[in-house]
Amino acid sequence: MSSEMPLPTTIVAPTCSMGEKNVLKRYRRQVSSTRNFKRHVNTNVLRKRRLAAGVRCHDRFYKRLYAEAMCLGSQVYDWPGRSFAKIFGKVMVLDVFKQLTDFRLVFEVNLERRRPDCICMFKLPRDLWEVGCDGVCVILELKTCKFSRNLKTRSKHEQRLTGIKQLLDSKSLIGQIAPQGSDCIVICPMLVFVARRKLSVLHVMCLKKRHIVTDFHRLCSILATASDYKARITDTHKILKRHNTNTIHIQRRSGKASANVTDLRNHIACNKTATLSFSNNQERTGGTAMRNMANIIARLVQRP
């Protein structure tokens, strides 16, 4: 056996003709273009989904803020809700809200160039909050966040810059459309970050205030006229489908016929008969369901 080592063999790359090379180039070009197209489509779909999720979150937060504001104006509740307190507590002490003489809340006000999410108008006794101040105009710009743990991400930084620019423009536009008057109003722009899932207020950022002299009630009328959104608490219930409107449980759960069920029970307990007067809309939409429900309750009451 010889001690000489065999020489290493060189591996020659396989050769292919020009036609095969062109076929490979064409295939790679098609694959890369398909991948880019899919990536572009996925980006557009994600952008649309994020936009739709933000719109839904805005709508839900509008209803919550509206409900808490209505509780503030009622005589039953002496303290505002959590979101209301966390936002407007940055502007003034919450005890001041108990002495409000007027309160207006409008959503999505169309100011031509800008469209602030929410504008709150507070009418106060003079010198209660600040010297010479008759009212406060709070401009809210909402930014929804899917992930609420870290507020220093690049996307939230972009949201912060965009929101600040929107608030500054809205502040100047309100100063331009404000009519002449004798009320000293303080404009307070505020940027609010809201969790998309739980609707909790994550962070509130207050910008520089501005004092204007205008008429409070006329300014409220102008802003209410320019609003493109009307808060309706009655829209919080889901619309019942035709195939499941015949059960009392679903009627109760939706809250659509709770008052009618209570009145019906009281009437049956007294007269042992089931009679209900429906409006035209109830006859057209829920007449059959209500008649079936009346028959069921009448049978339950007649049992020994």
Curated annotation (Swiss-Prot):
Subcellular location: Host cytoplasm; Host nucleus; Host Golgi apparatus
InterPro entries referenced in this protein's UniProt entry, alphabetically: Herpes_UL24
Alphabetical keyword list: Host cytoplasm, Host G2/M cell cycle arrest by virus, Host Golgi apparatus, Host nucleus, Host-virus interaction, Modulation of host cell cycle by virus
Keyword hit for Lipid metabolism: no
Alphabetical GO biological process terms: symbiont-mediated arrest of host cell cycle during G2/M transition
Main location: host cell
GO CC entries: host cell Golgi apparatus; host cell nucleus
Annotated function: May play a role in the dispersal of host nucleolin from the nucleolus throughout the nucleus leading to a decrease in ribosome biogenesis.
Family as reported in the entry's similarity comment: Belongs to the HHV-1 UL24 protein family.
Protein name: Protein UL24 homolog
Organism of provenance: Gallid herpesvirus 2 (strain Chicken/Md5/ATCC VR-987)
